Amino acid sequence: ANLVAKKFNCTAVITGKVDIISDSKRLAKIFNGHPQMSKVTGTGCMSSAITGAFAATTNDMFLAGIAALTSMGIAGEIAYEKTQNLGTGSFRNAIIDSISCLDTNTILERGKIE
């Protein structure tokens, strides 16, 4: 992430088991999310859309990336809690529901940012 951010003079946002955000000067790791998210088509697209939405609200793309991936990860965790005995279709819909219901307190309580 640091190399990409430095080479292209941008903020790099990389998703995975641990999400990484870097602007070449700062680095953050997000430990939210659930493995089930990798089994559903569209979670990457959702993450991109949410990142764009947060980017539109600030000049600090590093903070926008942190906010976006933390929100998406928490939504995935909540969705899994609600649908762990159901299929991936229910899980995908629950992610959408969870992201639309997130509030500041939930993000502050559940966010795992290093």
List the model feature ranges, each with a label.
Residues 52-90:
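Conserved post-catalytic alpha-helical subdomain immediately downstream of the catalytic base
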Residues 74-114:
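Charged C-terminal helix
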